[in-house]
Swiss-Prot record:
Catalytic reactions of this protein: (2R)-2-phosphoglycerate = (2R)-3-phosphoglycerate
Protein name according to UniProt: 2,3-bisphosphoglycerate-dependent phosphoglycerate mutase
Assigned EC number: 5.4.2.11
UniProt keyword Isomerase present: yes
Family the entry assigns: Belongs to the phosphoglycerate mutase family. BPG-dependent PGAM subfamily.
Record's subunit section: Homodimer.
GO biological process entries: gluconeogenesis; glycolytic process
Superkingdom field: Bacteria
GO molecular function annotations of the record: phosphoglycerate mutase activity
Keywords, alphabetical: Gluconeogenesis, Glycolysis, Isomerase
Length: 250
């Protein structure tokens, strides 16, 4: 049976991950640790014999720079790459820039958990005159006003990620090309929920660690057979737990 592999990588730690702030569509770069995580992901993939024909990422530099570092370690810096806003992180609305722990102290751990992980829960909206509104950013100039979020739930994130998967990424895989996606915690959670047919309760508890390759294997009908992280299992579990704890009051 022919097995097709797909690699997903959440960007390495960003400067705002380090500062425990809601990031969303804000274009913050990788921290030094994040660069190291991205390079380590590339080394792991090289050790396991991976190489790729095409890469996808978002239009946010923490994901783009993660992909650059991964491909550099694979000696595949030349690889064709498609960047799409549809792979962007979930938009956190008026929470963008706020410290997660301080927000939890103000609103409570459970409210912040729902804002971060709830399926259909949207954080408070931005207003269009807010400098954080994506309509002020030239990279989104070709998007319609309807496509520009004031805030997003995971459900709304799924509404943009999954059509991009089915219409753009999956056909390339079906043509025989080997694909890697470097994206974000929530855009990848959206894809994982779809691939694994997870319930809303199950996705609430899913935390994807930064800078760790997640491999999916598909059968000849492109149904997922299994998935697994590359690397030390204890270290990966600790990183996922750290992601879960970011939204708790100190």
């Amino acid at each position: 049976m022919a097995v097709t592999k797909l690699v997903l990588v959440r960007h390495g730690e960003s400067q705002w991950n380090k500062e425990n702030r809601f990031t969303g569509w804000y274009d913050v770069d990788l921290s030094e640790k994040g660069v190291s995580e991205a390079k380590a992901a590339g080394k792991l993939l090289k050790e396991e014999g991976f190489s790729f024909d095409f890469a996808y990422t978002s239009v946010l530099k923490r994901a783009i720079h993660t992909l650059w570092n991964v491909l550099d370690e694979l000696d595949q810096a030349w690889l064709p790459v498609e960047k799409s806003w549809k792979l962007n992180e979930r938009h956190y609305g008026a929470l963008q820039g706020l410290n997660k722990a301080e927000t939890a102290e103000k609103y409570g751990d459970e409210q912040v958990k729902q804002w971060r992980r709830g399926f259909a829960v949207t954080p408070p909206e931005l207003t269009k005159d807010d400098e954080r509104y994506p309509g002020h950013d030239p990279r989104y100039a070709k998007l319609s006003e309807k496509e520009l979020p004031l805030t997003e739930s995971l459900a709304l994130t799924i509404d943009r990620v999954i059509p991009y998967w089915t219409d753009t990424i999956l056909p390339r895989m079906k043509s025989g090309e080997r694909v890697i996606i470097a994206a974000h915690g929530n855009s990848l959670r959206a894809l994982v929920k779809y691939l694994d047919n997870m319930s809303e309760d199950e996705i609430l508890e899913l935390n994807i660690p930064t800078g760790v390759p997640l491999v999916y294997e598909f059968d000849e009908n492109f149904k997922p057979l299994k998935h697994y992280y590359l690397g030390n299992a204890d270290e990966i579990a600790a990183k996922a737990a750290a992601v879960a704890n970011q939204g708790k009051a100190k």
